[in-house]
Each structure stands twice: as C-alpha cells, then as structure tokens.
Regions:
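Hydrophobic, well-structured mid-protein blocks that either form specific transmembrane helices
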Residues: 90-130
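Charged, alpha-helix-enriched surfaces in structured cytosolic catalytic cores
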Residues: 11, 15-18, 22, 83-86, ...
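Conserved small/polar residues in nucleotide/adenosyl-binding loops
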Residues: 141-142
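Short, charged, amphipathic alpha-helical segments
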Residues: 48-58, 86-89, 121-125
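Hydrophobic/aromatic-rich structural module bridging two neighboring secondary-structure elements via a short loop
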Residues: 56-60, 68-99
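Alpha-helical transition-metal enzyme core signature, strongest for iron centers
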Residues: 27, 57-68, 95-102, 128-131, ...
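Leu/Val/Ala/Ile-rich N-terminal alpha-helices, chiefly Sec-type signal peptides and the beginnings
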Residues: 2-63, 68-71, 75
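Short, surface-exposed loop/turn segments at secondary-structure junctions
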Residues: 43-51, 77-86, 114-118
Length: 143
C-alpha cells in the first residue's frame, strides 16, 4: 500500500542529500582554490595560472548555482514539510553568497590588480586562510 510512495519519497530524499553534499563540496573546493589564489597573486601578480584559477572559481560558482536551483525545485515540488524547506533553502542561499564572495574577490584581484606592500603579504595570506577555515567550519556545521 505504501511501498511505491515511500520508495519515491526516500529516493528523492537521498537525491536531495547528494545534491546538497555536492554543493558543500563545491564550496569547499572554491575555498581551497581561493586559499591558493591569494599567495599566487601576491607573489606573481596576474599570471596565466592565476587567470586559470579565477576561471575555475567562476565555473564552480556556476555549477553551485545549478545545484541550488535543482535543490530548490525539488524542495518546492516534493518536500512535505514547508518549515524544513525554508530552512534548507536559506542555508543554501547564504552558503551560495559565500561562493559569490570568493568569486567577487577573485575578480577584484584580476580586474583592479591591487598592489599590496610586501610587509602585508604574510598577513593577507594568513587572513585568507582563516576566512577559508571559517567557511569550512560553518558549512559542515550547518548541513
């Protein structure tokens, strides 16, 4: 009696979990790339490798947006509990903003080409590592 609906419901839940895991993995990957971009920029300026990494961040951000839209569609069409739906969507939106901030900072480096005094390089690298570590902590704590 409940076999088909239950299997479908649990199947959708597993798929939703996989999509959210993919999203969190992308957030983590973008953070790791960003952690590498800052010292690369500070040491080499706007090198080809730097441009490639900025492009990589942009591609991952686009992929994360697609996953977010798919999760949103699934939640609205197939989730039975509206309160849980809004909580998950809000968390995803906030984490997507973090990816957007990473991307925005990469573009700022790429377009504006700021020149940081050498004495600040170590602190900027340390700050970027701390930011990435904080994002990692937040993303795995909330989902």
């Amino acid at each position: 009696m409940f076999g088909f609906k239950t299997e479908s419901l649990f199947g959708q839940t597993k798929q939703l979990e996989r999509e959210i895991d993919q999203f969190v993995d992308i957030l983590s990957e973008v953070g790791l790339v960003f952690k590498s971009i800052v010292p690369l920029y500070l040491n080499n300026g706007n090198a080809d490798k730097f441009d490639g990494m900025v492009q990589q961040v942009s591609e991952m951000e686009s992929k994360a947006d697609k996953i977010t839209k798919e999760v949103e569609r699934t939640l609205y069409e197939e989730t039975l509990i509206p309160d849980a739906r809004s909580d998950v969507l809000r968390l995803l939106e906030h984490m997507d903003e973090l990816i957007g901030m990473y991307q925005g900072n990469c573009y700022h480096f790429s377009i504006q080409k700021p020149d940081f005094p050498k004495e600040f390089h170590e602190d900027l690298i340390s700050l970027s590592e701390t930011v990435v570590n904080c994002v990692e902590s937040v993303s795995y704590t909330h989902l």
